[in-house]
């Protein structure tokens, strides 16, 4: 079996993975800013890095996985004011919602979920270190900014040179800055802001900037240098670039060894945005599709590729997952342990060790399903369930998935309806009213239900 290789955004190539401490992996992922419900782009970040930590653990590593929560931000302050509620109430409500969404998608809890507001002292210490190193200055408006041009390595992650950069999207233009590209480390308090977003500091009352939050939490929980830092491609610049500048500017050594970024999510080949009316929260998607279908849809694409969300692609994912569960119906896995030396398992591991190549890994799962259809082998069923379980799939009884409603919450009503229709069809056949029996079968098929007549008069059903 080949060793794990990871595409390192910083190096712009796949590299063999060698942790700082043998057998142990320290990993940080940028989490959610909790002022609204999580959308399908957040779902991809959750599922992708859940996959990464699952495979690392399955490979024998001891993993310390940190995914932060941004619970102080301009958007949070604005939303709380609009709602007329406290910031703590707003953020707790959406943290609870985020946890529910993550659990529905089969995302395991990180080892640590630090909230930014609990790490302000560490942020202040980091800013003081930057000031001592000549990289931070207080501007005329009271903010403390980072002097980008005084950090020689700025731009190495994004591949952008300072001369090519301009103050654009997500880069504040502020007349108090020495350079438009400088970014805020500490925001001075505004009179209209609530007291719960004001902290005392040597520079005056204020609150942390977005970028310093992640640097401080990561270094506090994982050390000044750690193995993997992940997040969405949209965070590569400026957020992750600025994290490097802050962390390495303070410590004077490498911050992160491997940078991982998952690709964008598009909707029907367009950028997802509220203005285009194609913005979907996880909850909206789960109202239409089973949560495992959504997870499978995300995992079928390579994490670095663009993911195109559409009903057609979700329908295809549901049908594909149905094929695998159908293969397991009536074939109970044997009780032996998963055999990672078996041929399918070796190919699965090869795929996962090749920068978490889930399209190839999923192809191996389909090969197993096809062989189970032919052989009805309990040993192969065990391999399929075991390998799929590593990536958080196929862990329900087959009949439970095959009977599941299109949307979460519909299962009970749908099952009752189908059972009643099957009984009516049985009675029609007993009365030799075969036209009525055929009509019931056709009506159920229109609703996405397939009936399968078995010996002895038994009828089973599943989703199409």
UniProtKB/Swiss-Prot annotation:
Its EC number is 6.1.1.16. Coiled coil: none annotated. SMART domains: DALR_2. One of its GO terms (biological process) is cysteinyl-tRNA aminoacylation. It catalyses: tRNA(Cys) + L-cysteine + ATP = L-cysteinyl-tRNA(Cys) + AMP + diphosphate. A motif ('KMSKS' region) lies at residues 271-275. Its main location: cytoplasm. Transmembrane segments: none annotated. The keyword Cytoplasm applies. A motif ('HIGH' region) lies at residues 32-42. ATP binds at residue 274. It comes from the Bacteria. Keywords: Aminoacyl-tRNA synthetase, ATP-binding, Cytoplasm, Ligase, Metal-binding, Nucleotide-binding, Protein biosynthesis, Zinc. Its cofactor is Zn(2+). One of its GO terms (cellular component) is cytosol. GO terms for molecular function: ATP binding; cysteine-tRNA ligase activity; zinc ion binding. Binds 1 zinc ion per subunit. Zn(2+) binds at residues 30, 214, 239, 243. It is found in: Cytoplasm. InterPro entries: Cys-tRNA-ligase, Cys-tRNA-synt_Ia_DALR, Cys-tRNA/MSH_ligase, Rossmann-like_a/b/a_fold, tRNA-synt_1_cat_dom, tRNAsynth_Ia_anticodon-bd. Monomer. PANTHER family: CYSTEINE--TRNA LIGASE, CYTOPLASMIC, CYSTEINYL-TRNA SYNTHETASE. Belongs to the class-I aminoacyl-tRNA synthetase family. This is Cysteine--tRNA ligase. It comes from Janthinobacterium sp. (strain Marseille) (Minibacterium massiliensis). The lineage of its organism: Bacteria, Pseudomonadati, Pseudomonadota, Betaproteobacteria, Burkholderiales. The gene is cysS.
């Amino acid at each position: 079996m080949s060793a794990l290789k990871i595409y390192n955004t910083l190096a712009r190539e796949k590299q063999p993975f060698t942790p700082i401490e043998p057998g142990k992996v320290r990993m940080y992922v940028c989490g959610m800013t909790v002022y609204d419900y999580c959308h399908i782009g957040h779902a991809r970040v959750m599922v992708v890095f859940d996959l990464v930590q699952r495979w690392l653990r399955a490979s024998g590593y001891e993993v310390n996985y940190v995914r932060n929560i941004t619970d102080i931000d301009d958007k949070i302050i604005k939303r709380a004011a609009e709602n007329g509620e406290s910031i703590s109430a707003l953020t707790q409500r959406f943290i609870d919602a985020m946890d529910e969404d993550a659990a529905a998608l089969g995302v395991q809890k990180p080892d640590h979920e630090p909230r930014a507001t609990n790490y302000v002292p560490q942020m202040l210490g980091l800013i003081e270190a930057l000031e001592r190193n000549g990289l931070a200055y207080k501007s005329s408006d009271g903010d403390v900014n980072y002097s980008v041009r005084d950090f020689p390595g700025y731009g190495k992650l994004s591949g952008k040179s300072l001369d090519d950069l301009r103050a654009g999207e997500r880069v504040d233009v502020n007349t108090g800055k020495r350079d438009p590209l400088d970014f805020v480390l500490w925001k001075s308090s505004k009179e209209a802001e609530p007291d719960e977003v004001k902290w005392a500091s040597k520079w005056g009352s204020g609150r942390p900037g977005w970028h310093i939050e992640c640097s401080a939490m990561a270094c506090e929980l994982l050390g000044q240098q750690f193995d993997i830092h992940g997040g969405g491609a949209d965070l590569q610049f400026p957020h992750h670039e600025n994290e490097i500048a802050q962390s390495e500017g303070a410590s004077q050594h490498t911050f992160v060894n491997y940078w991982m970024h998952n690709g964008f999510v598009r909707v029907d080949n367009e950028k997802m945005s509220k203005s285009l009316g194609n913005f979907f929260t996880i909850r909206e998607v789960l109202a239409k599709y089973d949560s495992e279908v959504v997870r499978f849809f995300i995992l079928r694409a390579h994490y670095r590729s663009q993911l195109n969300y559409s009903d057609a692609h979700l329908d295809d994912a549901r049908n594909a997952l149905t094929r695998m569960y159908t293969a397991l119906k009536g074939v109970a896995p044997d009780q032996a342990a998963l055999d990672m030396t078996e041929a399918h398992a070796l190919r699965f591991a090869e795929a996962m060790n090749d920068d978490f190549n889930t399209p190839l890994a999923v192809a191996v799962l389909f090969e197993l399903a096809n062989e189970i259809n032919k052989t009805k082998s309990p040993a192969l069923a065990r391999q399929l369930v075991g390998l799929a379980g590593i990536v958080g799939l196929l862990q329900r009884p087959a009949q439970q998935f095959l009977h599941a409603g299109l949307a979460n919450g519909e299962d009970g009503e749908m099952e009752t309806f189908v059972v009643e229709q099957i009984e009516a069809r049985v009675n029609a056949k007993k009365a030799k009213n075969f036209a009525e029996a055929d009509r019931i079968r056709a009506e159920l098929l229109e609703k996405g239900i397939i009936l399968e007549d078995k010996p002895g008069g038994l009828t089973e059903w599943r989703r199409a």
